[in-house]
Regions:
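Hydrophobic, lipid-facing positions within transmembrane beta-strands of outer-membrane proteins
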Residues: 57, 93-99, 146-152, 172, ...
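Transmembrane beta-strands of outer-membrane beta-barrel pores
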Residues: 63-69, 117-125, 170-176, 209-215, ...
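Outer-membrane beta-barrel "beta-signal"
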Residues: 224-227, 296-302, 306, 337-353
Length: 353
């Protein structure tokens, strides 16, 4: 009797299992065709880097050395009748510290904001016997030129393909030595605004406008950003007309660059005016140069990289002017000339991962 019950229950369970399997095989999945996802699609944003690009420098400590050159300081007369003589002086070398920091304070998919500071000094070692009768040569010999400032960069991706990039800096430029406090009238403000496209992870392109002093005086110029990695070895990194580089990647820890950079600023000569009791109220040195260069950058330990740069400094402008009047057609107080030396710069850099 028990065996009959067990056999009957086995037949029932087997029938239910077979029926269930057939039901699964014959189920009409078309009923799910119109089901929609309830979640909102995640929006993607482009990044500020390209694949294969050079690592971003967070902190840099450097030393700049320029070889022998000759400065010809033209004579000039002051409004009250004073006259300052023409003088030609040999410079044995220029040297100075280069320090930079650019630290991200906000870094997420929607915003990247960095705050930074910079210091660049140029000391003048004139040949022995230099008279320094011309006020410009005298202040360069005594004080040199110094730039120190603060800056910020904001990268705002709009979507996966477009972005806005803004930069702003406030620099104090003048004939003051390192350790001396600059004054308010030595402040210069620069800024840039670009709109860009990132079509692939290996290419960025942007156009915009910049207020800059790289040409030695206040200028408003169009600018172009173009960063592209062509293959595993070659690429370009440009922000025209300020700088441009062809990049060759030896491996992930060694890179070579060939290119140029336009360097310059307008320096308020407060010490020169004070020492010579000048009747001019706003004498400035309009300094600008083009540096054609080769650079080798390599990792020395983890994220610490060394950069060795060598090239030729081409003087573009070294004139003295009174006041800062954008678009002014008045003549320079003195149109000076400066010959072109070779130069070398070495920097130790902490780079981003």
């Amino acid at each position: 009797m028990n065996y009959k019950k067990i056999s009957l229950l086995s037949v029932v369970f087997c029938s239910i299992a077979v029926t269930s399997m057939r039901a699964q095989e014959e189920e009409d999945y078309s009923q799910y065709a119109n089901v929609e996802a309830t979640g909102t699609p995640t929006k993607t944003y482009c990044t500020s880097k390209i694949v294969g690009g050079s690592p971003s420098k967070l902190i840099s400590f450097g030393y700049d050395f320029q070889g022998p050159s000759t400065l010809t300081a033209r004579s000039f007369s002051a409004p009250l009748g004073q006259s300052y003589p023409w003088e030609k002086a040999d410079i044995e070398y220029n040297s100075g510290l280069r320090v930079m920091a650019s630290i991200p304070v906000i870094s997420n998919t929607k915003w990247i904001v960095t705050l930074g500071a910079n210091l660049a000094e140029t000391k003048y070692a004139f040949a022995s016997g230099t008279v320094a009768a011309n006020p410009l040569i005298a202040t360069l010999k005594e004080n040199g030129l110094t730039t120190m400032g603060l800056n910020t960069t904001i990268f705002k991706p709009l979507n996966a393909k477009n972005f806005i990039l803004t930069q702003a800096s406030a620099d104090w430029n003048g004939d003051f030595a390192l350790g001396k406090m600059p004054t308010a009238n030595q402040l210069k403000v620069s800024a840039a605004l670009l709109y860009g496209w990132k079509k692939t992870d290996k290419q960025m392109f942007a156009i915009g406008v910049s207020r800059t002093y790289r040409g030695g005086q206040q200028l408003y110029v169009p600018i172009i950003l173009y960063n592209k990695t062509f293959n595993s070895k070659w690429g370009v990194e440009c922000l025209l007309p300020a700088r441009g580089n062809i990049r060759y990647t030896v491996n992930s820890r060694n890179m070579l660059f060939a290119g140029f950079e336009l360097e310059g600023n307008s320096y308020r000569l407060n010490n020169m005016m004070k020492d010579y009791n000048s009747p001019y109220s706003a004498l400035e040195l309009r300094r600008s140069e083009i540096r054609a260069r080769l650079t080798y950058e390599f990792s020395v330990y983890k994220f610490w990289w060394l950069s060795v740069q060598a090239g030729y400094r081409l003087n573009y402008k070294y004139n003295m002017d009174d006041g800062e009047f954008y678009g002014s057609e008045k003549d320079f107080v003195a149109e000076n000339s400066l010959t072109n030396p070779f130069y070398m710069m070495v920097t130790l850099n902490l780079v981003s991962p």
